[in-house]
Design a protein with these regions (language model features):
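Phosphate-binding glycine-rich/basic clefts of nucleotide- and phosphate-handling proteins
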Residues: 171-273, 300-301
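Catalytic phosphate/nucleotide-handling subdomain of diverse soluble enzymes
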Residues: 303, 311-341, 367
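Conserved phosphate-binding catalytic cores of ATP/NTP-utilizing and phosphoryl-transfer enzymes
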Residues: 1-6, 120, 130, 134-158, ...
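Conserved phosphate-binding loops in N-terminal lobes of ATP-dependent enzymes
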Residues: 2-127, 136-138, 166, 176-180, ...
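Acidic, glycine/GT-rich loop-and beta-edge segments that sit at the periphery of enzyme/chaperone cores
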Residues: 196, 204-243, 334-335, 339-400
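Phosphate/ATP-binding catalytic cores across multiple sugar-kinase/actin-like superfamilies
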Residues: 87-95, 261, 267-298, 317
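A short acidic Gly-Thr/Ser loop motif
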Residues: 9-14, 150-152, 157-165, 170-174, ...
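Glycine-rich phosphate-binding loops at beta-strand->alpha-helix junctions
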Residues: 111-120, 128, 226, 300-321, ...
Length: 400
């Protein structure tokens, strides 16, 4: 790795993925900050600041009983800048091992959510220059980077991570803001739903210390049912979907219909009281809001991204739902119109490494840009032009 290799930093609600432009895979850690839970007398006796006693990432998760944990990113948007700086310091100084001197010779590529407010984007850049001292900064939309990882410039991205799901149409590298959809249901919500469903059957798994164990269970045994009613019948009448799972503390849990009913909330949010259509209908609505001549291209290039799309059966369910919606709403159920032609053209890409597609796409782009400073917003431009004018260099990557 050269001394001026660009840094790539993908900021997720639940996890940060960081590395360099040449990295084949990212370093991943929880995007959280933990502050010690102190008794009253300890708090009164303490003269040190909370910031000095804060921990970041896996350490506070492993010792969550001792910390009050907060996440600086909520539903894809930064809500606490002091905590976000702590997370970035952990990524840049500790995980990547960079010194202040090394940072001054490097560029950094940051990712942002599809509907990130302009003021947040500018704040990110300001911190990278003023607090860290990077030589140059570039900010790119996560959905576009997902397509870059697939070698595409046009397509529709369904990205679902830990805290939020987005459906984003991209045409020639530009996102269509007006057609972008958001659902505040993703991995964390599915974990909470699994805890709730298991609790209904008498399993006491609602303790704070159980959350990570149940998340691991979710990732191990859950799947998306292509036909929910059929699987519910199988769960009632057979043991076809029953699986015994052992928690790290030795407790054994028999998981049955919970395996598919937990992730079902992504397709039917009303199951948890959320007034929204599910991801399949969001994809359908998104495509229908695109120009007529680009709709079929969208259907032919649907790309899944993020850890919450990795449930077995996710892609198959999405395609089935889209064909059903097209048959019902476009063909109006007309038996004389051939839905088979449409079904054959719907293509849902399920990249093996889609947990890290955004980071991979960022690495690809940073590699292309690394030897040309004119691509980046440089510190000199930032100081001479101000943040608003300097950021115009990147506006072509932002939303239409």
């Amino acid at each position: 790795m050269s001394s001026n290799e660009p840094v790539v930093l993908d900021n997720g609600t639940g996890y940060v993925k960081c590395g360099f432009a040449s990295s084949e895979s990212p370093i991943v850690f929880p995007s959280c900050v933990g502050r010690p839970v102190l008794r009253v007398e300890e708090a009164l006796a303490s003269n040190s600041s909370n910031e000095k006693r804060s921990v970041v990432g896996q350490e506070c998760i492993d010792n969550r009983q001792n910390y009050e944990i907060s996440y600086p990113i909520k539903n894809g948007i930064v809500t606490s800048w002091p905590d976000m700086i702590l997370v970035w310091e952990h990524a840049i100084y500790e995980k990547l091992g960079l010194t202040k001197e090394e940072i001054g010779n490097r560029m950094i590529l940051l990712t942002e959510a599809p509907q990130n407010p302009r003021k947040n984007r500018e704040k990110m850049v300001e911190i990278m220059f003023e607090h860290f001292g990077f030589k140059g900064v570039f900010v790119h939309v996560q959905a576009v980077l997902t397509l870059y990882a697939q070698g595409l410039l046009t397509g529709l991205v369904l990205d679902s991570g830990d805290g939020v799901s987005h459906v984003v149409p991209v045409i020639d590298g530009f996102t269509k803001r007006q057609a972008t959809k958001r659902l505040d249901i993703a991995g964390r919500t599915v974990t909470e739903r699994l805890i709730e469903l298991l609790g209904r059957r008498g399993y006491a798994v609602g303790r704070t210390s159980d959350v990570d164990s149940i998340r691991e269970m979710k990732e191990s045994v859950c799947f998306v049912a292509e036909e929910r009613k059929r699987w519910l019948r199988l769960a009632r009448e057979t043991t076809a979907c029953a699986e015994l799972y052992e928690l790290p503390d030795g407790r054994r849990i028999k998981v049955e219909s919970e395996r598919f009913m937990a992730p079902e909330i992504m397709f039917e949010p009303s199951l948890v009281g959320v007034e929204s259509v599910g991801v399949s209908e969001l994809v359908f609505e998104c495509v229908q809001e695109c120009d007529m001549d680009s709709r079929m291209t969208m259907y032919e290039n649907i790309v899944l991204s993020g850890g919450s799309t990795t449930f077995p059966g996710f892609g198959e369910r999405l395609k089935k739902d889209l064909v059903d919606l097209y048959t019902d709403r476009i063909l109006k159920g007309d038996p004389n119109r051939d839905v088979g032609k449409f079904a054959n053209r719907v293509n849902v890409e399920t990249p093996v490494d889609r947990k890290y597609s955004v980071f991979v796409g960022g690495s690809v782009l940073a590699n292309i840009m690394k030897d040309n400073d004119t691509f980046w917003v440089t510190k000199r431009e930032y100081e001479e032009l101000g943040i608003e004018k300097a950021m115009k260099k990147c506006e072509g990557t932002f939303h239409e």
